[in-house]
Amino acid sequence: MRVGCDIIAISRIEKIHSRHGKNFLDKFLSPKEQILIKNPATLAGLWAAKEAASKALGVGICELCSFFDIEISKDEKNAPKLKYSQKITKDFNITQTSLSISHDNGFAIAIVAIV
């Protein structure tokens, strides 16, 4: 099992988004993921989730794992769900993933566990 964690100030993501708009979103979220954004807290949570997912691999966001190798969605109970690209799943021998996202007191945090 490997674990990754990321925390970010919601105001930081909000500031970047207000400055760069959709161009910022397009750099790390697919159109399907952009639909999940309800407010700055959910946007920050998505950022933290992708960062945590890359850290769980032990590589971070780089040439080995781009933002688009990581897909965030929701399950039938509206809980966050994580899926890696086929290449990442194969290269890192991933059989299971778990993602938790939370927001409180101006911060968003995400924790990812992979097996």
From Swiss-Prot:
The entry's keywords = Cytoplasm, Fatty acid biosynthesis, Fatty acid metabolism, Lipid biosynthesis, Lipid metabolism, Magnesium, Metal-binding, Transferase
What does this protein need as cofactor? Mg(2+)
Asked whether the UniProt record includes Translocase among its keywords, one would answer: no
Q: GO CC annotations?
A: cytoplasm
Entries under Pfam families matching the protein: ACPS
Subcellular localization: Cytoplasm
The record lists Mg(2+) as bound by 6, 51
Q: Does the keyword Transit peptide apply?
A: no
Source species, domain of life: Bacteria
Q: Name one GO biological process term.
A: fatty acid biosynthetic process
Q: Which reaction does it catalyse?
A: apo-[ACP] + CoA = holo-[ACP] + adenosine 3',5'-bisphosphate + H(+)
Q: What is its EC number?
A: 2.7.8.7
The protein's GO terms of the molecular function aspect are: holo-[acyl-carrier-protein] synthase activity; magnesium ion binding
Family according to the record: Belongs to the P-Pant transferase superfamily. AcpS family.
Role this protein plays: Transfers the 4'-phosphopantetheine moiety from coenzyme A to a Ser of acyl-carrier-protein.
Protein name per the record? Holo-[acyl-carrier-protein] synthase
The major lineage groups are: Bacteria, Pseudomonadati, Campylobacterota, Epsilonproteobacteria, Campylobacterales
